[in-house]
């Protein structure tokens, strides 16, 4: 009974509470703020166009750059009412966040998931620039390193021979057209940041073949971030109508705008050539003393894809348990070893004992600019190394870069007099001795007696006996070497995805 009487009392109080409904009835007022964002589009639109206005009076390329920029603006393919709606949406987005500093990707039109991936590319562009700045600040710059190849900017070498992408990935190689192209429309050409010939590609797809679309976009991005100042790169990197953005948009799987892609690439070629002819790129290279690791890796991959990859089966014919086992240390590992840990400079000497197809020898010559030696005794690997070296010199000229001297020797390094002479001058020696027999490792220790004091030896097996072993009393390695054990992470070697140990020994 008390509960019932209590309930009755509550019913008498409730009715006035229900009348609070009045508040919800009078809430049509909030729509009034809608006009506020509409007042900002003119502000964001002027902000969007201002970088282009800053560019024309700034760049040393003068009229060539300003005219190229205007060409890029006037060539947006297929204008339509849908484009106007998208631009209106973009202006509204910018208005909503005008008071905040935005990331390069924040104002972009979203088409689908692929567009999100494209925006990741823009983030990559900025991250590479930040990485390059951070790298240059964290390491000592080799002021003696001269990156520029003067020959690349003097005149076009009509006799320059290199392997075009079309020579390994084309309709003739049973690839199929992409982006809805007919067989007559697949051909494209790409300008490098020098006066040299353009590379020929075909817009085709084939398993394990060069991807012309991806390669084109990466090359444009690398040129913009390495060879040009921010102002000079504006026609390339502009978020709305830059060459990179237009190429990514046109190649989007849901758009597949062949003519738009080719138009953007054609304008990129013309704009870059104008900058090269006006001396802008050459001047910028004069001010650089170190090569970004990701650019070096890309160039080396270009070489490998055109020389080794088509014949890679030749490297699988060697037996485990012998000194004739093939394996590669990958680009990030070599950068860590030569740039970060041993801090090599362009006036030093590098030697790779068992150099395979020459990957590390070429990377040292390109990324460090040092004198670089290698010796290999497997015939197939030697043949591929020679092919890589030939393409290496041509590619360096295309990119306008001057590498260090490259010397690739054939035969047993224990019996090669040129290698023995190079070892006496060496500052860093690499020995991928993971699969070497114990006899060969013992022979190497005796060779190290001729190394100069302070020379660094990088190996995957230690040349010093275990300190717990009773056999280290007369061990030559422990007498002449001080050893540091290190660990490399996943993805640093070709034969396994797992990490492992390596050793840096210093000649006493």
Predicted regions and their residues:
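Conserved SAM-binding motif I beta-strand of class I
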Residues: 371-376
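S-adenosyl-L-methionine
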Residues: 2-345
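Conserved class I S-adenosyl-L-methionine
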Residues: 346-356
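A positional/structural detector of protein chain ends, strongest at the extreme C-terminus
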Residues: 1-4, 506-508
């Amino acid at each position: 009974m008390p509960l019932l009487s209590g309930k009755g009392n509550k019913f008498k109080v409730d009715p006035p509470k229900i009348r609070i409904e009045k508040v919800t009835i009078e809430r049509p007022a909030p729509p009034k703020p809608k006009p506020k964002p509409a007042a900002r589009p003119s502000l964001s639109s002027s902000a969007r166009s201002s970088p282009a206005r800053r560019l024309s009076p700034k760049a040393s390329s003068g009229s060539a750059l300003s005219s190229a920029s205007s060409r890029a603006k006037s060539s947006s393919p297929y204008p339509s009412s849908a484009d106007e709606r998208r631009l209106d949406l973009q202006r509204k987005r910018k208005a909503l966040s005008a008071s905040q500093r935005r990331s390069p990707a924040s104002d972009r039109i979203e088409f689908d998931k692929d567009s999100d991936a494209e925006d990741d590319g823009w983030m990559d562009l900025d991250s590479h620039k930040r990485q390059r700045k951070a790298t240059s600040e964290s390491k000592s710059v080799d002021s003696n390193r001269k990156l520029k190849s003067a020959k690349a900017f003097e005149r076009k070498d009509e006799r320059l021979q290199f392997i075009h992408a079309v020579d390994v990935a084309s309709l003739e190689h049973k690839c199929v057209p992409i982006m809805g192209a007919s067989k007559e429309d697949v051909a494209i050409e790409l300008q490098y940041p020098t006066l040299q010939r353009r590379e020929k590609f075909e817009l085709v797809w084939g398993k394990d073949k060069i991807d012309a679309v991806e390669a084109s976009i990466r090359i444009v991005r690398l040129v913009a971030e390495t060879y040009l100042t921010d102002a000079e790169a504006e026609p390339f990197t502009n978020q709305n109508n830059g060459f990179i953005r237009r190429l990514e948009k046109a190649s989007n799987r849901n758009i597949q705008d062949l003519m738009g892609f080719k138009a953007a690439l054609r304008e990129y070629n013309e704009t870059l050539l104008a900058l090269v002819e006006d001396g802008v790129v050459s001047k910028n290279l004069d001010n650089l003393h170190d090569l970004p690791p990701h650019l070096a890796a890309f160039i080396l991959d270009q070489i490998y894809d055109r020389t080794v990859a088509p014949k890679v089966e030749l490297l699988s014919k060697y037996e485990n348990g012998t000194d004739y086992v093939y394996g590669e240390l990958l680009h990030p590992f070599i950068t860590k070893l030569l740039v970060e840990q041993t801090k090599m400079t362009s006036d030093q000497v590098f030697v790779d004992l068992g150099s395979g197809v020459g990957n590390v020898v070429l990377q040292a010559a390109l990324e460090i600019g040092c004198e670089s030696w290698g010796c290999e005794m497997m015939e197939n690997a030697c043949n591929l190394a020679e092919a890589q070296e030939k393409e290496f010199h041509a590619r360096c000229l295309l990119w306008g870069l001057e590498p260090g001297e490259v010397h690739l020797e054939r035969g047993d390094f224990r019996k090669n007099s040129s290698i023995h002479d190079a070892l006496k001058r060496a500052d860093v020696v690499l020995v991928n001795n993971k699969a070497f027999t114990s006899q060969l490792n013992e022979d190497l220790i005796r060779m190290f007696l001729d190394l100069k004091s302070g020379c660094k030896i990088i190996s995957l097996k230690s040349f010093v006996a275990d300190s717990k072993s009773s056999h280290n009393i007369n061990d030559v390695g422990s007498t002449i070497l001080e050893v540091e054990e290190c660990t490399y992470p996943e993805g640093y070697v070709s034969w396994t995805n797992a990490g492992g140990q390596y050793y840096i020994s210093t000649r006493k």
